[in-house]
Amino acid sequence: MNCTKPHVVVTGASTGIGRATARELAGSGWHVFAGIRRDGDAPSETTPLILDVTRPEQVKAAVVAVEQHVGAAGLAGLVDNAGIGVAWPVELVPLDALRHIFEVNVVGQVAVTQGFLPLLRQARGRIVVIGSIGDRMNLPFGGPLGASKAALAGLTESLRQEVAAFGVRVVLIAPASIHTEAVDKVEQGARRAVDEFPPELRDLYATSYTGMVATAMARERAGSPPVVVARVVSKALTARRPRARYLVGKDVRLLAMIAGWLPIRLQDAIRRRVFGLPAPGSLVQRVPS
């Protein structure tokens, strides 16, 4: 099919940052393939692409569909955005839940990138990966999500260097607090998680866990709207010399400075104060014998 617009694939385009990005790019002259998991979830101005990044057959079918559409022009952009968020204490996170978040946030992103790289090479296109400031500054009870984002950031850094010789550029977007529908999902998941804590450990974790989640999600609700990230994605796709990493969102530069410059002990103390966490050693008497 002939189309004079540059083509871009956006994964996780049903809601949040992905949906805002798909709409922003469509309004800026891109032909957007919106990766969604259910029919009817794509923004109206985009081409829907059924794409659950954890299902190899859907990834393969999506690549074939895009290839048939773009032809020799290739793919100008890929936005790796699909992801999920959960909050669990490391001691208590179900291993199946941990595996699933890595399947979506890491393995799925690599699978999509591998699938579309031949088309990106054709167009000397760009890959924009949606990460998180949490890849460098993780929160208590945010271990599973932060670990997946740190893994994704590491892979992105290697990928950027590996494909540069092909004319393909790779950019990592690191947002801080962004208000999306995911906030409600994390809160609901946290309420269910407490019910799953073993009774002998619930007394140790429940108060600090629920307090931290409530405070963190309140900060997310006060954060930037998804369109702020979408505009940075657009810039990363079109800038003559894009940065390797963009920081996005309220207080993100302050957080990056804290992560990069303050001693770990002081960072921990700040987080305890902000999130109302117990002091070191304060729960020793409550540890089951």
Describe each model-derived feature in a short phrase.
Residues 132:
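Residue(s) in the substrate-gating loop at a strand-loop-helix junction
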Residues 81-86:
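Conserved NAD(P)H cofactor-binding loop of Rossmann-fold oxidoreductase domains
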Residues 113, 148-151:
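Active-site helix of classical SDR
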Residues 14-15:
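Conserved glycine-rich cofactor-binding loop
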Residues 89-90, 97-99, 124:
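Substrate-binding pocket helix/loop in short-chain dehydrogenase/reductase
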Residues 165-219:
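C-terminal beta-strand-loop-alpha-helix "lid" module of Rossmann-like NAD(P)-dependent dehydrogenases
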Residues 51-64, 95:
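The beta1-alpha1 cofactor-binding region of Rossmann-like NAD(H)/NADP(H)-dependent oxidoreductases
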